[in-house]
Structures are given as C-alpha cells and as structure tokens.
Amino acid sequence: MPYGDDVPAEDMGYVHGINLVDELDEVEGFAGAGEPCAAASLASEPQPGQSAMPAWAQRVTAAGETGMLSPASVSPVPVPSAPALSADASIPSRRAPVVCAVSGSGGCGKSTIVATMAHAASLLGLRAAVLDLDLMFGNLYDLLGVDAPHDMATLIEPSAAGALAEPDIVTASMRVAPGVTLWGPVAAPEKAELMARPVELLLDVLRRESDVVFVDTSVFWGDAVAAAVAASDRCLVVGDAAVSSATSASRVIELASRVGVPRTRMSAVFNRFGARGADEDVAMRFEIACALSSKIRIADGGQDLAALMAFGRADEAVGQTSAFATSVREATREMLVELGCAVGPWSDMVADRATRTERPRIRLPWSREGDPR
C-alpha cells in the first residue's frame, strides 16, 4: 500500500476538516507551532540534578512491585516560573481531552470503537484527532477508509530538534472526513521504537488544535503508548466475552494505575454485548473484574457492522439506527460531556436516518406464489 509521495497533494493541507494555513491563525495555530512546542520541549528536558527518565517511567519506578505510590516516595519537582504573557497573547487555556482505548488482549474491538467514536464526535460538531499507536501493525486507516496511508515515521527526524512544524504534521496526517483526521501507524514496523518523542510532541500540538483526541493502542506498551496513556483524560478498558478478557483487563488497569492514571479516569467497556455468549452475566463478570465505577456497554453490530468496517465505512456504521450505533453515540456523547467538551446537536445525517423508513427493496421480475407468471 503506498505511503507519502503517492498521495494527492490536495489532501495534504487539511486537518480536522479545515485548512490549517488559512483558518487556524486566530487560535494558537500551526503557523507558530514550532515556538510553543520548543518551549514545551525545553521545559520537559532534564535539568541538571533531575532524572532523564520519562515522567510515566518515574511513576512506575516509584510504585515498585506493589503498584502503589506512597506520599513519601514522590518528592515535589520544582517548577520554574513561567514568563509573563503579554496582553495580546492568544494561548488557549483549555486543552482537548485525550481518550485512550486499551486492552490486555487483541481482537476485542477497540479499534472499531475508536473509529466509530471519532465519527460520532464529528457528528456532534467537534474536531476529532485520531492516533493509531498500534505502531507496528495497526490498521485503523483501513477501518476509516483511507486508501493511501501516510507514514507517521516522517515525524522522527523533525522531532530531534524538539519541535514539529506545520508541514511535518500535515504531511503525516490523513484527512478522513470533515472533523476527523488520522495519524499513524508507521510504514516500517522496525521504526516503532523511535516514535516516543514524536508522539509526545504531536499529542501536545493536537491537544491545542483539536477538540478531542482519540488514541488506539496496541497490546504491547512501548514508550509512545505509555506516554499517551499517562496523559489521557479517559482510559477506556475494552473487553468482550473471551475467556481471558476479564483477567487481562484487570492487569491493564493495574499498569495504567502505575503510569499515573487514577481509576476515576477509567471506564470498563464491554464490547459486543448481546452477541452469542455475551449476555448479562458475562458482562457483569467483566465489570466486576475491572472494579471501575464507570461502565459502558457497546451492543453487538453483527455481520452488518463487519461488512461496513471491511470497506472503511465507519461513518455509516455510527450513523445507522442499529443497537450498535445507538450505544456508540450515547456513550460518546455522555463521555464528551463529562470531559467538558462543548458538544452540539447531532448532525442532519443522524436525524435523517433516525426518521428514515426501511430501505426499499428491489422488486424481482416474478410474481408471488400462485400468481400467473
């Protein structure tokens, strides 16, 4: 599948459904993205006397084998005083929330949930940025209908300078639909281990430029995944009716706690509810094993959902009147409201499909039984 140079140039100037160069100057836009990123990177560089270990790794080390952070083990880190901002500074005070989908076993459907939730957010009038951090073998671009994926590894070289410029970010982006833009994975899986710093810089920019950031993760956590999970405002622990789903989910929750995510920011997401073998009892066992106060159930989409996702039609999947689409829309709206997003009414597509009658069927050229042919 082609990467980078094979993609038409007209798709390269759009992120979140708008033109970056023309329409993001009134906010802290990409035109000056180098300066804020450079300042943020300087603040995060290890100072003399400080450890060069990432913040999430410091928390894991402090937690030790118990997984608990004692108050005495975390010493306050002195924060240098920030320079006074001028009166005309236009830096937004609010940063977009980050929603990470994690799981302890593959095949539970978290990529489908991320893809459909991103489209649901766009139907609510939000600009959704999507990161596929299954860097080696992720296929979120397939589920979102991208024909020619861009290589996220192009961010490795510019990130060495401590900042990402607008052309670098746009080149690695894929405009999926108005309000939905995707980054990732990498074309060469062996470059995945080099993506920690680029992902941190990209995530910092996207939190300023978008309304919500959705992150799909891999079962194996590298530095990039751990940093994204540590920065998340909501961690979706996804599982299904598989035998090992509940056990692996509880282990993921423990790891997320050790990298700094409190359990109050986690939600137990039981996927494919209502399918064969995924009844109320199985869902309750999963939720009890997770022991989280926030619970979400996503209804089974069946073969109809599988057919749509196989052709990259996640937008149609979330716009239907099926039980799956309804559960995704309701869960997404409730979560975004809790995270403080300014959600609007559902777009006309959802309203039209909600009132639309059943699709007319083709009348075949023969009569009913008993009628003359």
Predicted regions and their residues:
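Cytosolic-facing regulatory segments adjacent to core modules
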Residues: 161-220
